[in-house]
């Protein structure tokens, strides 16, 4: 037991994530250590607006032999290499509890954000981002009529395993609740039953009052580095009011969401003057049977970027993180400050 007074900026500590029920080890004293690890080459930042060899550009032929239309806004098509199958059969039950198998069904789609091969989300005009939001909502609602979970997400950049440079996202519809969603369903419901209020609605109010982890605030939206963030510059984007699914957003809230996404992703790119890689996606109330209470759910987006110190140095979740629990050096408050310190106007637009 130490006689020194605890200081979260200097002393190692753990932070609890009430959404997942897991802890994150924070080691702020390590942030000053010298770095001699991997230094990756940054991705090519200048791309043409059209690439005749790109499978996602308008009028080009894909691997399947299908030809893309001359689309002007977003374009959605069935993933040519889907991870799920609509007609997959049920798996036989096993009498051995150590070898369980569950048959699953679903489908995967690709969403091209725009016809421009060179423009990522932060580089698109707000009205184009608004079109992406509308497409997300349409796809989620359509597939939610048949599947209990619909995951909308984007992997941006080669670092995140993106195999096509043309800016795009994906939609995976599942006949089952994935692990992350099942954990959130359990913890959100438990909080709601114990406190009589929505965890993330309460969290927004707490973050607005604190202020130290806020990155972007608009009329209807708040982006923060979560108190329990595991990735260096991880953020969560939430509405300021109780919204269970994207379909419940008003036109004003959707317009404002486009502005919030533009500001947040521009700050990411501006941090290291590069096309900032990340995995992002939306969480919202699953599509349970009609009549099921979903008031404990709150719409939110999660951004998980791997960059740590520069455009070429990234965080690796290895060793202790894989075998024990997530660990970070930079505190959430320090990360938020660094993101606040850069402009929300994209460096290419200045």
Regions found by a protein language model. Give the residues of each.
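A generic alpha-helix signature
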Residues: 131, 256-259
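Active-site microenvironments that recognize anionic phosphate/pyrophosphate groups
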Residues: 1-166, 172-244, 249-252, 265-266, ...
């Amino acid at each position: 037991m130490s006689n020194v007074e605890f200081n979260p900026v200097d002393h190692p500590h753990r932070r609890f994530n009430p959404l997942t029920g897991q802890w994150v080890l924070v080691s702020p004293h390590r942030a000053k250590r010298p770095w001699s690890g991997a230094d990756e080459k940054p991705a090519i930042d200048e791309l043409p607006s059209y690439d005749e060899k790109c499978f996602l550009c308008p009028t080009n032929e894909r691997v399947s032999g299908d030809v893309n239309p001359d689309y002007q806004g977003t374009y959605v098509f069935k993933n040519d290499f889907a991870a799920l199958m609509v007609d997959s059969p049920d798996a036989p039950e096993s009498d051995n509890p150590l070898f369980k198998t569950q048959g699953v069904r679903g489908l995967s789609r690709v969403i091209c954000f725009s016809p421009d091969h060179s423009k990522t989300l932060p580089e698109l005009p707000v009205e184009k981002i608004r079109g992406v939001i509308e497409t997300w909502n349409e796809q989620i609602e359509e597939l939610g009529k048949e599947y209990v979970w619909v995951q909308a997400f984007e992997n941006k950049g080669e670092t995140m395993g993106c195999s096509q440079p043309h800016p795009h996202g994906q939609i995976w519809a599942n006949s089952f609740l994935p692990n992350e969603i099942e954990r959130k369903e359990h913890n959100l419901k438990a909080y709601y039953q114990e406190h009589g209020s929505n965890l993330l609605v309460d969290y927004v109010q707490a973050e607005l009052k604190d202020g130290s982890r806020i990155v972007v605030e608009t009329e209807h939206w708040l982006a923060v580095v979560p108190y329990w963030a595991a990735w260096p510059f991880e953020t969560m984007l939430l509405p300021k009011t109780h919204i269970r699914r994207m379909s419940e957003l008003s036109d004003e809230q959707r317009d404002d969401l486009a502005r919030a996404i533009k500001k947040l992703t521009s700050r990411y790119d501006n941090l290291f003057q590069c096309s900032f890689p990340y995995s992002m996606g939306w969480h919202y109330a699953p599509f349970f049977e009609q009549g099921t209470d979903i008031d404990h759910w709150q719409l939110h987006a999660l951004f998980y970027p791997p960059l740590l110190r520069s455009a070429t140095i990234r965080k690796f979740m290895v060793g202790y993180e894989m075998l024990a629990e997530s660990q970070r050096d930079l505190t959430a408050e320090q990360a938020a400050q660094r993101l606040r310190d850069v402009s929300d106007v994209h460096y290419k637009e200045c």
